[in-house]
């Protein structure tokens, strides 16, 4: 097939063997199930309650047994052939003789949940029904083992336990309905059990000896109700496991899969124990990142008194077997910290272990977290008694801190003098300190930059000793002279304009392309891209800077679309948990586990495999750009979109995202890494200002993007909706040109998120190449004519868009 012909051809050409489609194929669904099992985390297993012995009789409690949540809402939703809930998964195990089920209970829940669905409820947003006492009595007579399933749903555009306090802020009608519905179901917010769930749990505990809990959730939830509860000896964090998540959970509880997932977030005793909770809902117009770099375990392992608030530490996860990790050696070699270790399976079952290497930098003048993850490695499946040697390494410069106030060297990464210590283990809390240290006699500047994207309204930030330091404030950046700002209502939800230029037919346009400048000449080496762009009229270049109409099964619009110049219309598609195609198209794709679960595998190779499989589905359906991965940090459990993001730790997020991008782009379709950056709150996300220090910005919130840019070369980056220190992210030249391109040498294209509140020509000037889902050509043209933007600035963005298109096959 010739260059770009796939983008013109409908229906699709199958990419599978023997003319079969790969989209939603049995092979991809099996991979989804495998990944789900790999990422589930066993957080409690007293008395070896799990796995269930063969033939165990089981009673299934909780509407979550039926009301399974495969993933979050919004861009993360996926149209699939089927969704396997936990009851269906356990029935498959029963058919194989592994367990025996008391069916009347799930049948009761099935009837109730169907009634709630019929009344308009969606998975995860249903009410826990009261179980009839006679059913409990019959179940108790049948068995002493019960499994409770708790489920949660969240989605794009709204946060958990959302509170709107600011006068003058008006909710959209769908936002209002979602918030009201959530409040009516989750009396204390969905971080905690509902009253109905709590009553059900108490009833089960009172009647059954062995109580197991399966948590079908997308992010952090309350764990205090089961952590020290003797009546609940086993708990599996099953997350949102995609279309086969219910069967994958059954695989784990029956022992067909030995859990090897590890937590990628810290689970504190209460929601109030997270430093971000205090001001998360303080205002809809801004969020102060006062905790600074002390996010997640960096806070709980460092700040005095915080460690005791942790129920389950970052990196924690149990197995049905046991492992012994021995450090064989540690050294600094060629600018890298290198640690060699051996892992031996000392138990009776085959299993996998994750070796985690942390470092602790000297406090110095800047202050540092007590521990920071430097590297990690997951073993292969080790048989009983088998040993594997692993090597973990990272550069010495990775331990540098950014000095944003000039305490050591202004706007520089510095390694402060002193001893750097190291820890190896299978979670941050239990990692053992090594005898080896890296000693630095003098402070060293590893990279010198300039101040970019600095805060103006952030008044204070947390220090390592638990106190706060005051930060300089001012009135904020002064906006350059330009056109009067558009009314925000004109920036909401408009479709790309379809212009019938002199009513020319497509054939006429193709004929024109034979004599016009043609992008195919660049493909064939007849002219350079610069030469091609120089020949295009300014109006054509401006046209390229906005989204284009959908073709085929696409519903998130295209890029390019100048056939008279040989430029194809490259389609985009959501989303993070699988290729998202509207149900009316009749195309079922594969729903992968949510990003948090994938991160919990601690297995970049597996994530890359999923990226490749997902990329095949995207390509087969004539889509060019897949709007994933999303790598924002789990700053707070309250963010409604955490299921779509990987972790509280930027290294895990970056390594996971880079693996996904490599897999996707091996199929020559483009990744769009999002949301750049600090999109850690959904409420008023288009106008909320994230106030964050330069240090926290670089060390925490930009770091995952930096890793992906340097390790995976993504075709595109998606700028976020929010403001960052008073400047719209899509108009933020400091970020898009200064850091992304100037410091990291990013060569790809930047797109806005869909229907941002940024002014199109200002976004272009900042280095945001294309405005999605539609551009405002007349505004850019007016700004050009009035001298507020130059042809060179327009052409630079157009060239980056065309470079991206040239990378497609």
Where are these regions (language model features)?
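Glycoside hydrolase catalytic-domain context in secreted enzymes
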Residues: 1-430, 451-809
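Short beta-strand elements
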Residues: 430-449
